[in-house]
From Swiss-Prot:
One cellular component (GO) term of this entry: host cell nucleoplasm
SUPFAM superfamilies (UniProt xref): P-loop containing nucleoside triphosphate hydrolases (SSF52540)
Higher taxonomy: Viruses, Varidnaviria, Bamfordvirae, Preplasmiviricota, Tectiliviricetes
This protein's encoding gene: IVa2
UniProt record similarity statement: Belongs to the adenoviridae packaging protein 1 family.
Name of protein: Packaging protein 1
Superkingdom per UniProt: Viruses
Region of interest (DNA-binding), ranges: 440-449
Physiological role: Component of the packaging machinery which encapsidates the viral DNA into preformed capsids and transcriptional activator of the viral major late promoter (MLP). Binds, along with packaging proteins 2 and 3, to the specific packaging sequence on the left end of viral genomic DNA and displays ATPase activity thereby providing the power stroke of the packaging machinery. The activity of packaging protein IVa2 is stimulated by protein 33K which acts as a terminase. May be the protein that pumps DNA into the capsid powered by ATP hydrolysis.
Induction record: Expressed in the intermediate phase of the viral replicative cycle.
MF GO annotations: ATP binding; DNA binding
Length: 449
């Protein structure tokens, strides 16, 4: 059936198009600008206003993002400059210290930049980025050891709950070995605080009364810590630690080796709490035929298994010579092997100190080993009763070598960080060497023959 005057129905979702003016060409739409970063070949149409029945192009178009200046790769931000400056101060101090040593002639001279400004100007993007990462590593190493230190930077403990504590004290006569032993206990550098201290000497009669009183006073002082409102807090399970003096011959009695024997004086004390055994002036006795090495390795574990209250076992032995010739039973050799700590007086003979440093610094650069020897030499010329401590099993690598000062306390020497900084100096030296080699090769090619 034919219908007249009806428009065909519009398709669904189809918008009405504006009718173009007769005799007028359809206006070309404005060009569409887009960011060259978008690689879409068929982008979606951009929504715009209806141009109206006149068919004119819209007056507004999508504007291009204004061009940004290219960022230079060799420009450092403020944080990077701060990192490089901080690292440069450390490198400059280490370099000047190494140059001022008496043994600096034996070291390989390292090339370096003349100043910080020269480093920032001529260092190059790659080297400066490496230095930023190296300084971040140094900061991480310092932050790792910070929880183990007090607010003033000193160590809060010598063993940090490591047990058993087997330590050897090396020092000549008059260097303050007895005072050092008392200070270790009175300043609570050995934790936990021992409740019974055994003082072993060749003969009991050779201990002066003044020294006995000093021992009793200082171990009692180390048993307490200051509390709030002027109070004191006991650091162990007793109000007054026991001080027991013994002769060396009583130490080596057979029943003192058996922890199940009721006559064992060490087992009786271990049943109450931690103990400490101090051997002073006993080097000649240790070099005899009677073996006492059980006190250094087997005895601590037996006491701890049988007496749970014995949470701490400390043995400190005094030696006047780092390499005694008389050691028939092997006690001194076994003691050095089992020892966890070596407390060394800088007044020891230089040949013995150099031998010890060469033995226990195999993993350090040669320059840092020479620096450690120079530290020993420097403190040997002073009158302070200071000590340098080597820890075989430190709580952190930075605490492996420490310096004990009567006023400053136990300070870490951070030889691991000094070794890291020396490797950075070597990296700068290699970079400058490579540049010099490339410059010589370039000039050789450009020079007419």
């Amino acid at each position: 059936m034919e219908t007249r005057g009806r428009r065909p129905a519009a398709l669904q979702h189809q918008q009405d198009q504006p009718q173009a003016h007769p005799g007028q060409r359809a206006a070309r739409s404005a060009p569409l600008h887009r960011d060259p970063d978008y690689a879409d070949e068929d982008p979606a149409p951009v929504e715009r206003h209806d141009p109206g029945p006149s068919g004119r192009a819209p007056t507004t178009a999508v504007q291009r993002k204004p061009p940004q200046p290219a960022k230079r790769g060799d420009m450092l931000d403020r944080d990077a400059v701060e990192q490089v400056t901080e690292l440069w101060d450390r490198l400059e101090l280490l370099g000047q210290t190494l140059k001022s040593m008496p043994t600096a002639d034996g070291l390989k001279p390292l090339k370096n930049f003349a100043s910080l400004q020269e480093l920032l100007s001529l260092g190059g993007e790659r080297l400066l980025a490496d230095l930023v990462r190296e300084n971040m590593r140094v900061r991480d190493m310092l932050n790792e050891v910070a929880p183990l230190l007090r607010d003033d930077g000193s160590c809060s403990s010598l063993n940090y709950q490591l047990h058993p504590v087997i330590g050897v004290i090396y020092g000549p006569t008059g260097c303050g070995k007895s005072q050092l032993l008392r200070n270790l206990l009175s300043s609570q550098l050995i934790s936990p605080t021992p409740e019974t201290v055994f003082f072993i000497a060749p003969q009991v009669d050779m201990i002066p009364p003044s020294e006995l009183k000093a021992w009793e006073m200082q171990i009692c002082e180390g048993n307490y810590a200051p509390g709030p409102d002027g109070t004191i807090i006991p650091q162990s399970g007793t109000l007054r630690p026991r001080f027991v003096k013994m002769a060396y011959d009583d130490l080596i009695l057979e029943h003192n080796y058996d922890v199940s024997d009721p006559r064992n004086i060490f087992a009786q004390a271990a049943a109450r709490g931690p103990i400490a055994i101090i051997m002073d002036e006993c080097m000649e006795n240790l070099g005899g035929h009677k073996g006492v090495s059980k006190f250094f390795h087997a005895f601590p574990s037996k006491l701890h298994d049988k007496f749970p209250k014995c949470t701490g076992y400390t043995v400190l032995v005094v030696l006047h010579n780092m390499n005694p010739r008389r050691d028939m039973a092997g006690n001194i050799a076994n003691l050095k092997i089992q020892s966890k700590m070596h407390l060394i007086s800088p007044r020891m003979h230089p040949s013995q100190l150099n031998r010890f440093v060469n033995t226990y610094t195999k993993g350090l650069p040669l320059a840092i080993s020479l620096l450690l020897k120079d530290i020993f030499r420097h403190h040997a010329q002073r009158s302070c009763y200071d000590w340098i401590i080597y820890n075989t099993t430190p709580q952190h690598e930075a605490l492996q070598w420490c310096y004990l000062h009567p006023r400053d306390g136990l300070m870490p020497m951070y030889l691991n960080i000094q070794s890291h900084l020396y490797h950075v100096l070597e990296k700068i030296h290699r970079t400058l060497n490579d540049r010099d080699r490339w410059s010589r090769a370039y000039r050789a090619r450009k020079t007419p023959k």
